[in-house]
Structures are given as C-alpha cells and as structure tokens.
Regions:
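Aromatic side chains
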Residues: 11, 21-22, 64
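Short Lys/Arg-rich basic patches
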Residues: 1-16, 26
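Residues at secondary-structure transition points
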Residues: 12, 16, 34, 47-51
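Residues in the helix-turn-helix
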Residues: 14, 38, 55
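C-terminal structural segments of small proteins and small subunits
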Residues: 45-68
Length: 68
C-alpha cells in the first residue's frame, strides 16, 4: 500500500492505495492532460457515499474493464 496526502474541498486527507492503482490514476490524468489532484477531485465529487479509496479503485476498474 502507498499512502498519499492531498487536499480536497479545502481539507487535507490521506488515501492508501496499491501502487498499481496510483499508476493507473496517474496514467489517466496524463491522458486527459490534467493534474492527478484534479482527476481525484472529479472522482471525489461524483462518488455516492463510498469511501474515497473505494471510489478511486472503482473508477480505475471502469477504465480498464473490457467493453463488449
């Protein structure tokens, strides 16, 4: 697990994720041409009650899940 601290909605928070999830988030932010913090903010604002780490994992899985 890798723990990172960031500011969301004016509050400092820490998130622990596996390195592969951090790498996927960084890759997605780079593809979109936005900062990692901006991507995490978008996911945070869209989540429906899940804790932030879970919401980030679900977002990553959604990007990499095969579509049929």
């Amino acid at each position: 697990m890798e723990k990172r601290s960031l500011t969301l909605a004016g509050h400092r928070t820490s998130v622990s994720l596996e390195p592969a999830f951090w790498a996927a988030l960084e890759e997605q932010a780079a593809r979109r041409g936005i900062a990692l913090s901006a991507l995490i903010r978008e996911i945070d604002e869209a989540r429906a009650g899940d804790n932030l780490a879970s919401a980030l994992r679900v977002a990553v899985l959604g990007w990499y899940r095969p579509t049929s």
